[in-house]
Amino acid sequence: MRRFTLTAALVLLAGLSGLSGHGAEKTKLTELMQRKLVNAQKVLAAVATNDFKAIRKHAEELIDISKEAEFKVLKTPRYELLAEDFRRAAGELVQSAKDRNVDGASLAYVQMSLSCFKCHKHVREVRMARAD
């Protein structure tokens, strides 16, 4: 489990380097991504310990972070779809916490993580295509 957390953290942090922005915009985006990573790690710890209150709290925080206007990295239909997938999975985490369903929370966490990986891949691909 710890290895998965470390891997997820490295992937998310690696994605930060592919994000564009200038000055305050880049700083704000980096801060939001770091908050997202911290909360995702806290959700994982809460799922592992059946701490449903913490699952709900940090999943709700992740939803709020994803809705912040500055969080919009790209204006593509695919990005919007991936962002919605992330919020849906985080919402499933909230519901699983309310239901005290650790299996549902575990699955929702994996789905949320996959949405992060897919989104970071999409952002890198779009950035590389624009750089060409």
Q: What residues fall within each predicted segment?
A:
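Bacterial N-terminal signal peptides that target proteins for export
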Residues: 1-9
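Enrichment for repetitive, rod-forming helical segments
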Residues: 9-10, 43
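Hydrophobic h-region of N-terminal signal peptides that target proteins for export
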Residues: 11-20
